[in-house]
């Protein structure tokens, strides 16, 4: 299988989507940030010095999804119809799971937008809590599902 972002001369190229059909595209990705009990309590109780941590992470995830084509070199700019961010606190593990759903009507998928949104949202949590806990760990960033397009649907088996 040939990589789609390389031309015949093996140089980087942006995929031509001119002949693709416009379809509804949707992708959901998630990731986890683990932290100390003190950092977790600060995040959940909104007592961080930098403001409301989870709400800021939601806004950052939305912004990250919208800016994907500006920071990932071969991503096409997309007209995004919907971005939904969910945050799930996991008190027993002192962790937060952040998920991003992105939807559009377009010629190319929104997987990268969902993954970028998750990454930026989790990095924002790290930034806002690093004064409390520099040992936080961001992990398990993964595409959980996607629908639409030529390659069909995908659902992660372990999700």
From Swiss-Prot:
CDD domains: MoaC_PE (cd01420)
InterPro entries xrefs: MoaC (IPR023045), MoaC_bact/euk (IPR047594), MoaC_sf (IPR036522), Mopterin_CF_biosynth-C_dom (IPR002820)
Acetylation among keywords: no
Gene3D superfamilies with a match to the protein in the record: Molybdopterin cofactor biosynthesis C (MoaC) domain (3.30.70.640)
Pathway participation: Cofactor biosynthesis; molybdopterin biosynthesis
Gene Ontology MF term list: cyclic pyranopterin monophosphate synthase activity
Pfam families, per the entry: MoaC
Active site annotation, chain numbering: 127
Reactions mediated catalytically: (8S)-3',8-cyclo-7,8-dihydroguanosine 5'-triphosphate = cyclic pyranopterin phosphate + diphosphate
Electron transport is among the record's keywords: no
Signal peptide start and end residues: none
Residues involved in substrate binding: 74-76, 112-113
Source superkingdom: Bacteria
E.C. designation(s): 4.6.1.17
Keyword terms of this UniProt record: Lyase, Molybdenum cofactor biosynthesis
Gene Ontology biological process terms, A to Z: Mo-molybdopterin cofactor biosynthetic process
HAMAP family: MoaC_B
Quaternary state and interactors: Homohexamer; trimer of dimers.
Family of the protein in this entry: Belongs to the MoaC family.
Function of the molecule: Catalyzes the conversion of (8S)-3',8-cyclo-7,8-dihydroguanosine 5'-triphosphate to cyclic pyranopterin monophosphate (cPMP).
Name of the featured protein: Cyclic pyranopterin monophosphate synthase
